[in-house]
């Protein structure tokens, strides 16, 4: 017998609802069986935002044009990038498209198979996947990547939403793997040594 969100066991009512996700759970719990679909949906949403921003730039800013965005900090500048993130490896569009496709496939498999089992680790893979797919779409259908964010306070390459996802996701994934994976995913590294030590003891 159960009530609304309640379950009767041994004459005692229990709450049978899972607690809502929160930052504390994200940082402290690991769920190897967690459904990867929410992360796929988040990646799709980030790709949609990236493509929407690029579409608005294409429709409203001429090539090389400038539009104020955040005074004294950022302006929107329409640039066609035939290279990788931040204009690296220019004029290698199709090679970069193939690399982006391969990376996207690897990231999908890693996310789906639980390369990182903790939600925080999976979030880093989600950011990387969104960035790779966002720029892959440009290279495949336009032959170049649309960049628009131009920093006014420093000499830096013009970039886009997908580039932000790649950089934030890449740095976060590296830091997570090096410094947090052992703590948040204790069974991931050194499990063999731990089992041997227990057997010897």
Model region roles, listed by residue range:
Residues 9-17, 21-201:
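Alpha-helical transmembrane bundles and membrane-interface segments of multipass inner-membrane proteins
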